[in-house]
From Swiss-Prot:
Residues 214-496 form the YjeF C-terminal domain. Its cofactor is K(+). Residues 1-208 are annotated as: NAD(P)H-hydrate epimerase. Residues 216-499 are annotated as: ADP-dependent (S)-NAD(P)H-hydrate dehydratase. This is Bifunctional NAD(P)H-hydrate repair enzyme Nnr. Bifunctional enzyme that catalyzes the epimerization of the S- and R-forms of NAD(P)HX and the dehydration of the S-form of NAD(P)HX at the expense of ADP, which is converted to AMP. This allows the repair of both epimers of NAD(P)HX, a damaged form of NAD(P)H that is a result of enzymatic or heat-dependent hydration. GO terms for molecular function: ADP-dependent NAD(P)H-hydrate dehydratase activity; ATP binding; metal ion binding; NAD(P)HX epimerase activity. Residues 57-61, 122-128 are annotated as: NADPHX 1. In the N-terminal section; belongs to the NnrE/AIBP family. PANTHER family: ATP-DEPENDENT (S)-NAD(P)H-HYDRATE DEHYDRATASE, ATP-DEPENDENT (S)-NAD(P)H-HYDRATE DEHYDRATASE FAMILY MEMBER. It comes from the Bacteria. It comes from Aquifex aeolicus (strain VF5). Pfam families: Carb_kinase, YjeF_N. (6S)-NADPHX 2 binds at residues 318, 438.
């Protein structure tokens, strides 16, 4: 499912009307019917409803909705936020008057209603809200009455995750044909409540050039083992990292890689820390490399000498941030000619190095898996700007540096060297625990060892999020640990592969 910006939705609306030939009033009718059905679904006990309408098409949707409500036995009042309407909204108001519904002459007591419908501003609005309408929105929010927003909560921008003030805080948002960025990116998404997407007969192919997609289970291409397979055919991965105080990170990655289907998992760690790993790893093997409390740059040649044993390399988990670490990461970017994933301190060391030419010049694009703080170091953008615009900034970085990116957070963005982006919006706050990123790094390294990279990232991110939800259901949001996510991977696989 495509995720659109305001100008893209406007263009598609116009093409639907002018080129396809579906009249705007038909689209409005379909939209209002969709909102009506969702009100009946989510608010079955609401009988006394107020529609607050703006003067444009969003207001027109609200006025058409008022007609459907009235004709189906609801008690409906309409209040015009600007005291006037235009275009198709004016047509809808004239219809209402002919069936006996007149707009209220003064602002009502919002608390008297069972439900308020926000139809003030649509996707074309640019914040902030000013004047009397700003006060109106504040009063609606303060009423404690459930709110349904049409298309987007009034006061938000469709194109960003920023939560502008004032803006309506909806319990349900019903949008049309395609979701918008504000429906998913935080903190704006918290203003949207539950989001429902209604088909209003706009042809889907009109959005074919949009490079933003919502990642859903139906988009996945699960890997299937051949009946005559063997362990090395299922991917031999090398995970490099670990330092004093952070040995657990790469261990968690290794165990996750095994659970994610890697045929063989080897952990490359500083030689003096090997006894720790030998005591904690059973199914996975350890590879002692040059280094005492952390890896030495001499480990690069040791890794490259063994490159034929491995199909993919993951580096950075618990690695530490230091000058020699920069040399390790850059050298492997330049010399490792197979799939490579860079996580955690591997990313920090790359950011500290500051020159991403080795990233751009790779024949096989690298995979970077930063959280927003690490991505801030890579890009120079502050974390707030990234949070509000993470899809755009991820796409920009991947295209510019010819790499894959998995930008981790409450919403996870996968971006590709050709500028595509996939948004995973079905995770859980239970994953906000140390180590879950290391688990994801292990899952993804296992999958890129034997799958097309783009498909591997989509599958891995979805698996990780689903495993988090499985663990949360078995335990509790507060009690989930990173290792619980790993142990929940079998159930996540079953849900994707069987169901």
């Amino acid at each position: 499912m495509k995720i659109l910006k305001a100008h893209e939705m406007s263009s598609i609306d116009n093409k639907t009307i002018e080129e396809i030939g579906i009249p705007s009033l038909v689209l409005m009718e379909n939209a209002s019917k969709g909102v009506f059905e969702n009100i009946r679904k989510y608010f079955p006990d609401a009988k006394n409803i107020l529609v607050v309408a703006g003067k444009g098409n969003n207001g027109g949707d609200g006025l058409a909705l008022a007609r459907h409500l009235y004709l189906n036995g609801f008690s409906v009042d309409i209040f015009l936020a600007f005291g006037e309407v235009k275009g198709d909204a004016k047509t809808q108001l004239e219809i209402l008057k002919k069936i006996g519904i007149e707009p209220l002459k003064k602002k009502p007591d919002f608390k008297e209603y069972d439900l308020i419908v926000d139809a003030i501003f649509g996707t074309g609005f640019q914040p902030p809200v000013k004047g009397e309408v700003a006060n109106l929105i504040k009063e609606i929010n303060n009423s404690s009455v459930p709110i349904v927003s049409i298309d987007i909560p009034s006061g938000l921008s469709a194109d960003t995750g920023e939560s502008f003030e004032p803006s309506v805080k909806a319990d349900l948002t019903v949008t049309f044909q395609f979701p918008k960025i504000c429906h998913y990116l935080y903190p704006a998404a918290k203003k949207c409540g539950k989001v429902e997407v209604v088909d209003i007969s706009i042809p889907e192919f009109l959005a074919k050039d949009v490079k933003r997609d919502l990642l859903r289970k139906s988009d996945l291409k699960p890997y299937k083992r051949e009946p005559d397979t063997y362990k090395t055919k299922e991917g031999s991965v090398l995970l490099v990292g670990g330092s004093v105080g952070k040995t657990g990170a790469v261990i968690m990655s290794a165990k996750a890689a095994s659970r994610a289907g890697a045929g063989l998992v080897t952990v490359g760690i500083p030689r003096e820390l090997n006894p720790i790993f030998e005591s904690l790893l059973i199914e996975e093997m350890s590879l002692p490399l040059s280094g005492t409390s952390r890896l030495s740059v001499f480990c690069v040649e040791e890794i490259l000498e063994l490159k034929d044993r491995f199909h993919a390399l993951g580096i950075g988990m618990g690695m530490d941030r230091y000058e020699e670490g920069q040399d390790i990461v850059i050298s492997l970017l330049e010399k490792w000619e197979k799939p490579i994933l860079i996580d955690a301190d591997g990313i920090n060391n790359l950011a500290d190095y500051g020159d991403y030419t080795p990233l751009k010049d790779r024949e096989i694009p690298a995979v970077l898996t930063p959280h927003i703080g690490e991505f801030s170091r890579l890009t120079g953008y502050d974390t707030k700007t990234i949070t509000y615009n993470q899809i755009d900034i991820a796409q920009e970085f991947s295209e510019k540096n010819r790499c894959y990116l998995v930008l981790k957070g409450a919403r996870t963005v996968i971006s590709t060297p050709d500028g595509r982006a996939y948004l995973f919006a079905d995770g859980t706050p239970a994953l906000a625990k140390g180590g879950t990123g290391d688990v994801l790094a292990g899952i993804l390294t296992a999958l890129i060892a034997k799958m097309d990279t783009e498909e591997a990232l989509k599958l891995g991110v979805y698996l990780h999020g689903l495993a988090g939800k499985v663990a949360e259901k078995k335990l509790h949001t507060e009690s989930v640990k990173a290792t619980d996510v790993t142990e929940s991977l079998p159930e996540a696989f079953r849900e994707i592969y069987v169901n």
